[in-house]
Amino acid sequence: MAHKKAGGSTRNGRDSIGKRLGVKLFGGQKAYPGNIIVRQRGTKFHPGKNVGCGKDYSLYALKSGIVFFKKKKNKKFINIIPKILCK
């Protein structure tokens, strides 16, 4: 005879993988056209000059230059300063 009753099935044991969101290029780093600067859900960061916004709200560089973060009226903007102006 069995000395233990049958164990019930557990409802745990699942977890989703991380989505790798966040800032990919930080202030002062070089960016080239098409480089992803931020992966995000919603607009935590807004696109500024020379920065585009994808349909999943990812921000990417439109021109080559240096990444520059700026806060304006409680909104965070990301700009790209072109290489010509950086010299």
Swiss-Prot record:
| Example of a GO cellular component annotation carried by this entry | cytosolic large ribosomal subunit
Q: Which GO terms describe its biological process?
A: translation
Q: Which domain of life is it from?
A: Bacteria
Q: Which Pfam families match?
A: Ribosomal_L27
Single GO molecular-function term?
Answer: structural constituent of ribosome
Q: What does the UniProt keyword field contain?
A: Ribonucleoprotein, Ribosomal protein
Q: Which Gene3D superfamilies match?
A: 2.40.50.100
Q: Would the keyword ATP-binding turn up in this protein's UniProt record? A: no
The UniProt entry's sequence similarity note says: Belongs to the bacterial ribosomal protein bL27 family.
Name of protein: Large ribosomal subunit protein bL27
